[in-house]
A protein has these predicted regions:
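Serine-hydrolase catalytic machinery in alpha/beta-hydrolase-like enzymes
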Residues: 1-49, 160-185
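Short phosphate-binding/catalytic loops that engage adenosine nucleotides
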Residues: 2, 53, 142
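Short, solvent-exposed loop/turn and secondary-structure capping segments
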Residues: 16-18, 72, 104-107, 127-128, ...
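Primarily recognizes the serine-hydrolase "nucleophile elbow" in alpha/beta-hydrolase
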Residues: 31-110
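Short beta-strand/loop motif that positions the catalytic acidic residue
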Residues: 116-118
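Conserved alpha/beta-hydrolase "acid-adjacent" motif
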Residues: 123-132
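Histidine-bearing beta->alpha loop at or near hydrolase active sites
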Residues: 150-155
Length: 185
């Protein structure tokens, strides 16, 4: 069988849905979603101790900022900082993640297969940054791939009241690129 575990990093940080609107968690963006990565490692720790879960078959999937956690959980530097030695996800499925931040050693990843899914028309996060990141990882021989869905936006699988929606107003990182200061430890 398959078991699922839903991790809600946003509510723990004071960001909750209000009625049918989503409240943006500004702290997630201020720190480029890095706080969600340790959350993903703690979920892996918890799941790996469950007697009915095979710790070698746990995958991670995240959406938007959560997709960033799913994507970068395989970065060896972050695993060393926040992960548990010897414990790794079996697969990663980031859904429309922000790939527009470059971190030190972010191309030094584990052998976790990564499959990114993005919408061609996503204006929240630049799709080209995910394509470029995947190219860097493939050049290192990693098992990574990206699926770009034509004519789709950020949050393409989401529905409100059974209808496809797309919000043009709100936080938009679409033309921003970030790079970690290489002089920091």
């Amino acid at each position: 069988g398959i078991a699922t575990f839903v991790l809600d990093s946003n509510s723990a940080r004071g960001c909750r849905k209000q009625e049918k609107k989503v409240k943006i968690c500004k702290n997630a963006y201020l720190h480029q979603g890095l706080g969600h990565i340790p959350d993903a490692y703690r979920a892996l720790d918890l799941l790996s101790t469950h007697p009915r879960i095979d710790p070698n078959r746990i995958a991670v999937m995240g959406f938007s900022i959560g997709g960033k956690a799913a994507l970068y959980a395989s970065v060896k530097r972050f695993q060393k900082m926040w992960g548990t030695p010897g414990l790794d996800y079996a697969a990663s499925v980031p859904m429309y993640p922000p790939c527009n931040a470059t971190f030190k050693e972010d191309d030094e990843i584990t052998d976790t297969p990564i499959r990114i899914h993005v919408g061609e028309l996503d204006t929240y996060f630049p799709v080209d940054s995910c394509i470029n990141y995947i190219a860097r990882l493939k050049a290192k021989g990693k098992d990574v791939d990206i699926k770009v869905y034509p004519d789709t936006h950020h949050g393409f699988e989401g529905k409100i009241d059974g209808k496809k929606t797309w919000k043009t107003k709100g936080y938009n990182d679409g033309k921003c690129y970030y790079e970690e200061n290489p002089s920091l430890p």
